[in-house]
Design a protein with these regions (language model features):
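Catalytic cores of carbohydrate-active enzymes across secretory and cytosolic contexts
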Residues: 1-476
Length: 476
């Protein structure tokens, strides 16, 4: 059994993917093989976890009994088991049909079910117990995201010696939305169990501070509030990407060659317009398809000079809103191709698939215009990845004002995705921008991201948490 880690990450999912081929870097555990998943969070936390012999607690992604704890590249992994029922109620239900839509501005109506809440609580309790078991005395525990909002308080109850951080990867809603949540006081008290609660944007932190005062009468000053005789800090830490990794990939001759090949396969159009998202109703996929269709109908764009590639990664496929979205998106793609495609040249290439990092990098390199048009998004890493991949190539980013990334990527072609004419206008400006201007915009955004990468994000959060820990100790 894993014991006594000075640094523990608790997240819904483990940072590894199960491998089915013969990848040499994979590790075995109970007959199953794993490798680190390519996400930015893993890359950011890997050095900290490796240096401190850290532990990551999370679910393997499939229902049923969990494999035994194992190690991948110096990180101890403690898999959590979720039964079929728990996947349905805690993951698909309370996390992704109640909290996800509510925190994303109610863009789809959240569904409230009592039995989902009960299971959410039970599963959160199990994650907290697992963290309490592996954390060394005085350890730092960093809890991630909306699936585990009750964990900080549950953990503190069992282990008051721990320094507890929480980071919310999605937006934190304004008071009037949060107040709809039947479990609202419990969720808020859950988060207040942390010493530091991190948000993507300042607005999220402010919403949280105001909500605590409104719901629990907790006084605050600046970013610090007082709760049950403790200080809790709420601040913004905008997450970022592994900029160097994406730049390296985009510089790789094989990736460049693949980008050329992609353009050739698309019929060497003048303009390749790209969208890359999980197939999620928060991402504004339909809105951007509609803007493209209207520009084709207006004659401002035409096939085969302009083509669109929409990658829509399968996601949460058993949740009703996601099934409905898939039908709507696929109908719209069919309509556009029916009206504007030519034999052998569809107007929209729609790919409901997952890709490797290098294939994604090749797509970014191949695209003249990247469309990121969420109705609401905590950050949106795809926008940042596209910028990182465009080293010398210019290219233009159309970006929704409602993505957290819009707070940093000010040289993008910003738009309001609800305003169709505005989206069309931003897309046309991106398509027609001259090369010098495109390069100028891209290089300003790159300069920003080179400095504000995911490693900077993790160390800012952890330094801030350590400072709180230091202050606490000084007070005692
Ligand atoms: P979200 O976290 O809501 O899915 P983000 O844009 O912040 O949205 O992050 C998505 C991450 O998933 C990015 O790192 C992106 O590269 C990756 N990704 C998106 N689509 C695919 C895909 N089809 N295959 C593999 N990775 C993908
Ligand atoms: C968002 C959430 C993450 C989640 C990811 C993929 O980024 O903030 O917590 O892991 O989407 O969603 P999934 O439901 O497949 O884990």
């Amino acid at each position: 059994m894993v014991q006594g880690s000075p640094f523990v990450v608790v997240a819904n999912r483990l940072p590894v993917d199960e491998v089915t081929d013969d990848t040499p870097s994979s590790r075995t555990s109970g007959g199953r093989r794993w490798r680190p998943s390519p996400g930015g969070l893993v890359t950011a936390l890997h050095p900290v976890l490796a240096e401190h012999k850290g532990t990551w607690i999370g679910w393997s992604g499939t229902p049923g009994p969990a494999p035994d704890p194992f190690e991948v590249d110096g990180i101890k992994l403690v898999p959590m088991s979720l039964s079929e029922d728990e996947v349905e109620r805690y993951y698909e239900g309370q996390s992704n049909a109640t909290i996800w839509p509510l925190y994303h501005d109610n863009v789809e109506p959240p569904i409230f079910r009592r039995r989902w809440r009960d299971t959410y609580r039970e599963v959160n309790r199990r994650y907290a117990a697992a963290a309490a078991k592996v954390a060394a005395p005085g350890a730092t525990v960093w809890v991630q995201d909306y699936q585990l909002q009750l964990v900080p308080a549950m953990l503190r109850e069992q282990r008051p010696d721990l320094l507890i951080g929480f980071f919310l990867h999605i937006p934190f809603p304004p008071i009037e939305l949060f107040m709809q949540l039947p479990q609202r006081a419990e969720v808020l008290r859950g988060l207040l169990g942390a010493d530091l609660v991190g948000f993507q944007q300042r607005l999220g932190a402010q919403n949280f501070l105001r909500l605590s005062k409104h719901l629990l009468g907790t006084p605050y000053s600046g970013s610090t509030l007082e709760y049950e005789g403790r200080k809790v800090k709420a601040e913004a830490f905008p997450i970022s990407i592994d900029f160097a990794e994406m730049q390296r990939l985009a510089d790789n001759p094989l990736v460049r060659e693949r980008a050329k090949q992609i353009r050739a396969e698309l019929g060497d159009p003048k303009t390749v317009i790209l969208g890359v998202d999980r197939l999620d109703y928060t991402k504004g996929i339909e809105h951007r398809l509609k803007a493209f269709r209207e520009l084709l109908a207006d004659g401002k764009l035409s096939v085969p000079e302009s083509v669109m590639v929409q990658v829509a990664t399968p996601s949460r496929e058993r949740v009703e809103h996601y099934q409905a979205l898939r039908v709507k998106v696929e109908r719209e793609v069919g309509r556009i191709n029916g009206d504007f495609g030519k034999v052998g040249v569809p107007a929209v290439h729609y790919l409901h698939q997952s890709y490797s990092r290098s294939e994604l990098a090749a797509l970014y390199c191949a695209a003249d215009v990247m469309m990121v048009t969420p109705l609401r998004d905590g950050m949106n890493l795809v926008a940042k990845e596209y910028v990182a991949a465009r080293a010398e190539n210019g290219g233009a980013l159309v970006l929704s004002e409602f993505a957290g990334a819009a707070g940093e990527l000010r040289q993008a072609f910003l738009c309001n995705p609800h305003d169709l004419d505005g989206v069309k206008d931003a897309l046309m400006r991106a398509v027609t921008v001259d090369e010098g201007e495109a390069r100028r915009r891209m290089s300003i955004m790159q300069r920003h991201l080179r400095k504000h990468d995911v490693a900077a994000w993790a160390s800012e959060f952890l330094d801030s948490l350590a400072e709180i820990g230091g202050t606490e100790k000084n007070r005692l």
